[in-house]
Amino acid sequence: MSRPAYSEPEPFADIHIHFNWDQKEVTSASEVVARLRAHNAVLVQVSSTPPRLALELADAAGPWVLPYFSPYLTERHRTTWAVDDNVVAEAAKGLASGRYKGIGELHVFPDNGLRRENKVFNGLLQLAARYQVPFLIHTEASSHLFFAPVCQKYSQVRFLWAHAGNRLQPDAIDQLMQQCPNLWTEVSARDPWRYGKLTDSDNLLLPGWRELFIKYQDRFMTGTDPVWGNSEDNRYANADEAWDHYTQLIEWHRNWLKQLPPEVEEKIRLTNARKFISGN
């Protein structure tokens, strides 16, 4: 009996992955590349802590993996980057080398007292403008109004908004995208195991999302954001086995994407990322 022909999945632009120190402990760069290739991820953006690991993954893969410069120079910098002037200097060196293709992911939490006027934050934004590279930003705010003044002040910067504001609903996302034409939005980590609020228990898009994706079909992208167990208090005390869950994450994205009109699905799955990276 002949076996059914293998059908390769559609090419996928995974615009939000990580290869961090606590992931490298259990998954090598070559293993990450193999998993990406197995799922036909043809264009990938990676940020790493420390930043050099993004270069390591890009070297293992080739030009289809684009390394971003992470402001987290060590595993401790996620909570201290905003008070370390060396972050801007190191980012400037990284971008001047030509090897890093963007800045981020940068977590901006107003609840932690970070003000929009913060010197390090603005220094990084100025670098993005100077080198004309994208800025991957993760905001943790109850309203889109926190981020609006930033993307308006730096109108020359191409922002990629991680997780569509995490828990914000389509109406708030719509308002921000109207206010900031330089803002692109991605919905990584909106899966049921982390932020959620994109699909219901049957994996169907929740009200408002389909309409939002169609309205801004040229400015949405997606990615898997393979980080696992990050809601646990002791998250950084253990190795991160997220890459063992990559199939689960990417298949979930492929499923909800199929609920969109074919031309919109292809844009969000692939072609928007290509245009975003090229600056078009």
State what each model feature region is.
Residues S7, P51-L136, A189-P192, L198-T199:
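Active-site gating/metal-coordination segments in enzymes
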Residues M1-P63:
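An N-terminally biased module of ancient metal coordination in phosphate/nucleic-acid-related enzymes
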Residues R99, G123, R130-P134, K153-R158, ...:
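Glycine-enriched alpha-helix->loop->beta-strand junction motifs that scaffold or abut catalytic
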Residues L55-D59, T80, A91-A92, L114-N118, ...:
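Distinct, well-ordered alpha-helical segments
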Residues A13-I17, V44-V46, V65-P71, G102-E105, ...:
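Hydrophobic faces of well-ordered beta-strands that scaffold small-molecule active sites
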Residues I17-S28, E75-A82, D111, R194-L198, ...:
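Acidic/histidine-rich helix-loop elements
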Residues N20-D22, P51-A54, T74-R76, F109-N112, ...:
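Active-site environment of divalent metal-dependent phosphoester hydrolases
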Residues R158, N166-N280:
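H/E-rich (His + Asp/Glu) clusters that bind or coordinate divalent metals
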